[in-house]
Swiss-Prot record:
Pfam families in UniProt: CFAP126
Protein name per the record: Protein Flattop homolog
Membrane-crossing residue ranges in chain numbering: none
Superkingdom in the source lineage: Eukaryota
GO biological process per UniProt: cilium organization
Comp. bias (Basic and acidic residues): 218-252
InterPro entries assigned to the protein according to its UniProt record, in alphabetical order: Fltp
Assigned protein family: Belongs to the Flattop family.
Species annotation: Drosophila melanogaster
Residues covered by region (Disordered): 177-252
GO cellular component terms attached to this protein's record: ciliary basal body
């Protein structure tokens, strides 16, 4: 058993060496609070609001409205917005250089990518101006007017597909499409029927209207004479007779 026993014998090992008397400034006092003047009666015993109570106001806190939100809420926007709400502008009046810990914290640098914080009136360090409700309504009105003028609202951004092609490229593409249209689709119908598909635009000519096929003979090539044909037949019969004699001689 220890010679010196005390309930606080290990207190010095876990005690802080500095004064823990600092804290981040808060926007609202911590709850619960023991001051009597902090509470204000708003409703009567029957549950109805008292007549002197201000009924106009935002009871859900100061958050962004519908017209201040971006078109698409992404993860990057949420991180940026959270960093702004978590007190990035608390030390606006104190220009200072960021330490290594703050440089490594990319979430803290979401609102301002600079390494040195400026003065209070520095435009790079001031709060970003959000879109007002009137500006949002004006944009919506402009969009509705444009959609009323034309059937479909056209995008102002020119895409890469609408880039003008060279005339040579247009000709080659036209030839390719014509060749594709000339081919007839394989169907169970006869060839003489009317074209129903765009690639059957060239209707085949019926057999009655087709001109008679004439085989053109070259002028330089002489025609085979009947005498030459008969001589060729006789030579073949002679060769056959000689082959039979050879086989008979081998057999003996």
């Amino acid at each position: 058993m220890a010679l010196h026993f005390s309930a606080q014998q290990f207190e010095g090992r876990f005690q802080s060496k500095r004064l823990n008397n600092w804290e981040y400034p808060r926007f609202s006092p911590p709850r619960p609070r023991g001051l009597q003047k902090n509470a204000k009666v708003v409703a009567a015993n029957n549950g109805h609001l008292l007549p002197e109570v201000i009924k106009e106001g935002n009871s859900f806190g100061q958050y962004r409205g519908t017209y201040e939100l971006p078109r698409r809420i992404t993860r990057a926007f949420c991180a940026h917005y959270d960093a702004c709400l978590s007190g990035r502008y608390k030390f606006v009046d104190f220009p200072r250089d960021l330490c290594n810990c703050q440089r490594e914290n990319r979430r803290a640098l979401a609102c301002d990518q600079r390494l040195t914080l400026g003065h209070k009136d520095d435009p790079y360090w001031m709060r970003e101006r959000c879109q007002t409700k009137c500006e949002g309504l004006q944009k919506l009105r402009a969009l509705s007017e444009r959609s009323a003028r034309c059937n479909r609202a056209k995008c102002d951004v020119v895409s890469e597909k609408t880039v003008k092609m060279t005339p040579k490229a247009i000709k080659t593409t036209g030839v390719a499409t014509e060749k594709r249209r000339r081919k007839r689709t394989i169907t169970a119908f006869s060839k003489g029927r009317t074209a129903l598909h765009p690639n059957e635009l060239t209707k085949p000519i019926p057999s009655s209207e087709k001109p008679a096929a004439t085989v053109a003979t070259p002028k330089d090539k002489p025609k085979d004479k009947p005498k030459d044909k008969e001589a060729g037949k006789k030579d073949k019969t002679k060769d056959k007779g000689k082959e039979k004699e050879r086989k008979a001689a081998k057999g003996h």
